[in-house]
Amino acid sequence: MVEEEGMRSLERADLAGYAARSCRSRGRMHPEEFRDDRPAFERDRDRIIHCAAFRRLEYKTQVFVNHEGDYYRTRLTHSLEVAQIGKAIARRLALNEELTEALALAHDLGHTPFGHTGEEVLNRLMEGFGGFEHNLQSFRVVDQLEERYPGFNGLNLSWEVLEGIIKHSSPYDRPTGLIEGFLPGVVPTIEAQIINFADEIAYNNHDIDDGLKSGYITIEQLNGVDLWREVWERIDTAHPGLDRERKKFQTISALIGLLIRDLITATEANLRAYGVSTLDDVRRVNRPLVTFSSAMEERNRSLKRFLFTNLYRHHKVERMRVKAERYLTQLFESYVKHPTLLPRKYQQKMDTLGRERVVCDYIAGMTDRFALDEFKRLFEPYERV
């Protein structure tokens, strides 16, 4: 890894001792000459924002397929919400906000079209060829698949960003050659740990909003969940007579704030309990330091169970899952059987990467809209090719 110099003066002076710092980064894989003195993690964030994979997140779904309505969250809006929540937590813990933001914006770059259904389909189809997992695909995107710079593929991000992407929401000892050199079996920076929870806070609460908007779940159902009911009643007491729509937004906002405050308090207690004062201490302790309190963890688990049963397994969501499986399976099988259907630059990679992996990369990079259009072009007789 190549180190960068001259960044210390532009980085916040009040960062905690256990925060990651650009000036102490393990560097980048490829040497580069920079024309400005941005700190390394700020540069990483900027590269992520400007890459093609980030723009495609606008048309990749969370729960609702993109064409079902302009209101619903996409992977792009979700990533922005994760960044906002993550930075709010990082600021209060005196952590590196630029690293936190870079990780938030990159954490879903490897996601497939059609949400987690797409990931499940590709993992099944890639059995025997290395499988598919979206965190590792995010790594492939920033390490290999983006083609923007002379002399190397990928975005040439800092070591700490790559480590955080690989270890996002997952066991830290993944048995894969991808993380050799990224401390397998060791927890990542606290900034990376924050993103695991910012991700969860964002998608749980915003799936509630989208679920209510769609009519797939109701306030009456949610009031059976202790955590939601407590906040809903608090808003009702504070704002008597408030209309239902405003009350919903205020409840979601207050719930996000409640979860953030609990997370910060529990994390501060963990840092004190384990005597963590440096980043080396974070590695030495080698257990997650960012957590909810045990009480909040259980209450939040009940909310997640509710969403799984009532929203993610709603019959209309299930119908879209079945359709998505069909689209992606038929596309994959057709491309593997007839690789000349792929753009030439993908065909040229097959001798090196293997036909199945190239097809997998191509499909994983699709938006919902492109996948639907491609399915029509290949399988509907009156559709223009």
Curated annotation (Swiss-Prot):
The record's Gene Ontology biological-process terms are:
dGTP catabolic process
Domain HD: residue ranges: 75-204
Disulfide-bonded cysteine pairs: these are: none
Q: Name one GO molecular function term.
A: dGTPase activity
Q: Which family does it belong to?
A: Belongs to the dGTPase family. Type 2 subfamily.
Q: Which UniProt keywords apply?
A: Hydrolase
| The species this protein was found in | Geobacter sulfurreducens (strain ATCC 51573 / DSM 12127 / PCA)
Highest taxon listed in the record's lineage: Bacteria
Which Pfam families does its entry note?
HD (PF01966), HD_assoc (PF13286)
Protein name listed in UniProt:
Deoxyguanosinetriphosphate triphosphohydrolase-like protein
Question: What CDD domains is this protein classified in?
Answer: HDc (cd00077)
